[in-house]
């Protein structure tokens, strides 16, 4: 347990150091392929008891219409326990829920894991002081950090 208490903040710090936030999008570099990154993220959210509603492979969709797209996948997930308190602050937040994570490979072959910053969403909906946004932000940062961490994620 002491090891987890020591390692977890370091992993989170490393992930946040690599995070970029522009227009509310938090993007974290991944050392894994896009598929492996999304597989890891999906496993983590399922282990945390969240519902996975859909996993959308945009590259596969593009291929169906004769277009080429680098690996790009979206995971749609959530849980009323997290989303409802956010919507209690402003029901309009429902347009941005369930939560989504995007994993993509850029033109330089770097893989990224990105998500909308709940604090940005709270500001967008006029409830910047909503505690649920901060809680969701911490959870998403933790999930992202674990997904890109150099340790095994096992079912």
List each language-model region with its residue ranges.
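Bacterial N-terminal signal peptides that target proteins for export
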Residues: 1-8
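N-terminal signal peptide c-region/cleavage motif recognized by signal peptidases
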Residues: 14-17
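Terminal, regulation- and interaction-focused segments at domain boundaries
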Residues: 21-49, 145, 149-155
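Soluble non-cytosolic domains of exported or imported proteins
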Residues: 31-36, 53, 130-134
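Stable alpha-helical elements in mature extracytoplasmic
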Residues: 37, 41, 58, 136-139
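Compact, glycine-rich, soluble single-domain proteins
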Residues: 42, 46, 53-99, 103
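Beta-strand/loop substructures that line and gate deep hydrophobic ligand-binding cavities in soluble
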Residues: 100-130
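C-terminal partner/receptor-binding element of secreted or periplasmic proteins
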Residues: 118-155
């Amino acid at each position: 347990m002491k090891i987890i208490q020591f390692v977890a903040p370091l992993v989170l710090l490393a992930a946040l150091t690599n995070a970029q936030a522009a227009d509310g999008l938090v993007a974290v570099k991944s050392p894994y392929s896009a598929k492996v990154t999304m597989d890891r993220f999906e496993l983590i959210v399922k282990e945390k008891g969240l519902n996975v509603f859909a996993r959308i492979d945009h590259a596969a969709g593009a291929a169906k219409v004769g277009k080429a797209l680098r690996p790009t996948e979206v995971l749609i997930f959530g849980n009323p326990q997290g989303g409802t308190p956010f919507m209690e602050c402003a029901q309009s937040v429902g347009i941005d829920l369930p939560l989504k994570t995007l994993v993509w490979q850029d033109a330089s072959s770097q893989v990224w894991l990105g998500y909308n910053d709940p604090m940005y969403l709270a500001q967008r909906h006029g409830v910047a002081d909503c505690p649920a946004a901060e809680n969701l932000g911490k959870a998403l940062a933790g999930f992202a950090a674990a997904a890109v961490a150099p340790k095994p994620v096992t079912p």
